[in-house]
Amino acid sequence: METVTEEETKEGIEEVEQPPPRAKYTSHILTTTKIQTPVRIEYDPMKDDPPPAIITPSYEPLWKKNEHWGDRCDPPVLHDETEFIRIYGQNNNGISESTGLNYDDTFKHMKEANADIFCINETHADKMNAKNNRVLESSRRRMFRSKDSQYCNLVTSSSIAPITKYTKPGGNMMGICGSLVSRMRRRIEDKYGRWCGFALLGKDNREIIVLTAYNVPQETPAGDDTLHAQQTSLYLLDGEVDPNPRKNFIRDLHTLVKATKDNNQDLILMGDFNEVVGDDPKMMAKVLMAGDLTDVHAHKHGQAHIATYIRGRRRVDYCFVSPRILDHVLRCGFEAFHARK
């Protein structure tokens, strides 16, 4: 077998021009897309809906929502219980006026709610004013003594301090209706206008004390006719030096609640206490401990950051009950603001 060297190849073979070597890979055709700058659209907030880019979900706390909270206690919901007592509380921030129409409206709402006991805080009614008493009594007769209505007993409280106007800051009212009227043993009133209520006779001959209360929000008088100023003047007449109406409310309510427990009486305490109960251990928390009272709404539904004052963000209205009453609470809740108009 012969071999051919490189020199022999070059001399014996004619060289032919070769095409350039082909690449060992396949070329790819690249396509490019022109990226255009988006055109900015002018957004007119007075005419256009907000574009999606600026809509961000946000958490709305409970105190901002005007919604029902807790159980719904409308009569159709309660048709399955054979016997129950419905207690309804409200802070109207003033219902006293010379025509009695506001009283009529309030009583109408209480009848529509089928309230057996109703509690109204801040009536702005002056119990020392004879005309106001006549207007209130006339309204009660119109709304509760007609043929299609049940009877109602009322108790009210306001400070005994004199003022020059028809309306008087503060004031409380409670009504008991229907068959409960026959169980009334006595009315409970307070000359400082802090609370009022009834002592009712239970089925086991044990008294049930039902109270509605209102504590002043201010630490200073802030005016000549405010409830703070009224109570301060009365405490001074009683011989107290530098009285504090807010603290005196706690002091005297503590005494009343403790006496109720010592007398083996059951207690239902409702009202506007103008504090977040529990924030200050020297205020309403002290009263609850004295009577072994429980917040029924927190007991049933847990603690929640809800507002019970339409221009506020805190819960200042409560219903407290003694242990034996707590065992019989069926439902409880807060209606939305202006739910009854």
What is each model feature region?
Residues 1-341:
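A shared catalytic/ligand-binding motif for oxyanion handling
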